[in-house]
Amino acid sequence: MTEDEFRKKIIFICGVDAKRMLLCKGKYNLYYRCPRYDRRNRPPGQKACTNRMSIRERNLLLDRLWRAYENSTFAPGLRGEEGDVVYEVNELNDFYITVCIINTRTVRQEVIGRDRDDV
């Protein structure tokens, strides 16, 4: 598999809400965010999920994941950190690769590891 093919297979999942991260247009740049940031995508009264990742952070993470793939250390359960982004490879098959992420700079510590319905 080429690096380009590898990158196209990656799907980022919010580590707080277990939802697929969305590519969104910010004021100056594109970025990924949890869909539960938007009020329409969460139950009434639930706080917004602040998990997000810039394109720069995404590219650094993809570079790290590609290096792991090249070194034959890439497998489900692979965990690590790239800057403020903590990641874990969840699923790997012929069609896609899911990577769960939490940006520790944008997500409150007390939210990490808790059931989102409690927040």
Predicted regions and their residues:
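Basic, low-complexity terminal or inter-domain segments flanking catalytic cores
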Residues: M1-V119
